[in-house]
C-alpha cells in the first residue's frame, strides 16, 4: 500500500525546507497569492536536492486575500493566468535541474474548479498546452478530476484529513462549523482510514467513497511541522509507503 504526501510551499510559513524531508510532492506558490521569485527558487532547489516532485500552485491574482476569495473571471483570463504562473515556475525549475511534474490550483481557484466546469476546463487546457505529461492534483471525485481526464491528463485525486467534508464530497467552507479538524489524534486516525478504506465520514455522518491518491499536509500553524512528522511516522509504522504520484513516477 502506498500514498503520495503533498504540501503547499513558498507561502511564507518558514518550514518549507523541513517539510520537504517529509513529503513526496511539493506545490510551490507562484507569486499570485503568496511567494515570489526567491521563494520559488529556494523551494525548487530544496525539492531537487531531496528528490521531491515539483508542482506549481497557481491561484487567482489576489495576494490581499491569500487567493481565497472567489472570483468570476473569463475563461481566457484563467487560462492565461495559470499558463503564466506555470511558465514562471518551469523556468526556475529548469535552471535548477528540475521540472514541473504536476499542478495543484490554490484556494478559491481549486474550490471553484471542483464544481465549475468552465473554470476546470480553462485550467486543464492551460496545463495540457503547457505540457500534456504534467499531472493535475484535484479534489477527489470533483469536476476538475473529470476535466483533466477528458483531455488526456493524469488526474491525481487529493484528500484532506484535517478538513470537514460534505455528503457530496466537497469541503466544508473554512468559515463554517466543522471546516477544520484540530484534534491531532483524530486527524491521524482519519489519515490512515482514508488510505485503507478509501472513504471519509461527512459532517452529517454519511460515509463518502473517495479515491485517496495524495494527502495534503498543511504547513502553516505553530505545530504543523511536528504533526507532519507524526503523520509520516504513523504511515511508516503502518507499512504504507510514501511515493510521488502522477507524472513524477513516469
UniProtKB/Swiss-Prot annotation:
Pfam families: LamB_YcsF. One of its GO terms (molecular function) is 5-oxoprolinase (ATP-hydrolyzing) activity. It catalyses: 5-oxo-L-proline + ATP + 2 H2O = L-glutamate + ADP + phosphate + H(+). PANTHER family: 5-OXOPROLINASE SUBUNIT A (PTHR30292:SF0), UNCHARACTERIZED PROTEIN YBGL-RELATED (PTHR30292). It comes from the Bacteria. Keywords: ATP-binding, Hydrolase, Nucleotide-binding. GO terms for biological process: carbohydrate metabolic process. Belongs to the LamB/PxpA family. Its EC number is 3.5.2.9. Catalyzes the cleavage of 5-oxoproline to form L-glutamate coupled to the hydrolysis of ATP to ADP and inorganic phosphate. It is an enzyme of class 3 (hydrolase). Gene3D superfamilies: Glycoside hydrolase/deacetylase. HAMAP family: PxpA. NCBIfam families: PRK05406.1-3, PRK05406.1-4, PRK05406.1-5. Forms a complex composed of PxpA, PxpB and PxpC. This is 5-oxoprolinase subunit A. The gene is pxpA. Disulfide bonds: none annotated.
Amino acid at each position: 500500500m502506498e500514498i503520495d504526501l503533498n504540501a503547499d510551499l513558498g507561502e511564507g510559513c518558514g518550514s518549507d525546507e523541513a517539510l520537504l524531508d517529509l513529503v513526496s510532492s511539493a506545490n510551490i506558490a507562484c507569486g499570485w497569492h503568496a511567494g515570489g521569485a526567491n521563494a520559488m527558487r529556494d523551494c525548487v532547489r530544496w525539492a531537487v536536492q531531496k528528490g521531491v516532485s515539483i508542482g506549481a500552485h497557481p491561484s487567482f491574482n489576489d495576494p490581499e486575500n491569500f487567493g481565497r476569495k472567489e472570483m468570476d473571471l473569463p475563461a481566457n483570463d484563467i487560462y492565461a493566468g495559470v499558463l503564466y504562473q506555470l511558465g514562471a515556475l518551469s523556468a526556475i525549475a529548469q535552471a535548477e535541474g528540475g521540472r514541473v511534474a504536476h499542478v495543484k490550483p490554490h484556494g478559491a481557484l481549486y474550490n471553484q474548479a471542483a464544481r465549475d466546469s468552465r473554470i476546470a476546463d480553462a485550467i486543464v487546457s492551460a496545463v495540457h498546452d503547457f505540457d500534456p505529461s504534467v499531472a493535475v492534483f484535484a479534489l477527489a471525485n470533483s469536476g476538475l478530476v473529470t476535466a483533466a481526464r477528458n483531455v488526456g491528463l493524469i488526474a491525481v485525486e487529493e484528500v484532506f484529513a484535517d478538513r470537514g467534508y460534505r455528503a457530496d464530497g466537497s469541503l466544508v467552507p473554512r468559515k463554517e462549523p466543522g471546516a477544520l479538524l484540530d484534534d491531532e489524534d483524530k486527524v491521524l486516525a482519519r489519515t490512515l482510514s482514508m488510505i485503507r478504506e478509501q472513504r471519509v465520514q461527512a459532517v452529517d455522518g454519511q460515509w463518502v467513497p473517495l479515491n485517496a491518491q495524495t494527502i495534503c499536509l498543511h504547513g502553516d500553524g505553530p505545530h504543523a511541522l511536528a504533526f507532519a512528522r507524526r503523520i509520516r511516522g504513523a504511515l511508516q509504522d503502518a507499512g504504507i509507503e510514501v511515493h510521488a504520484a502522477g507524472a513524477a513516477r513516469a
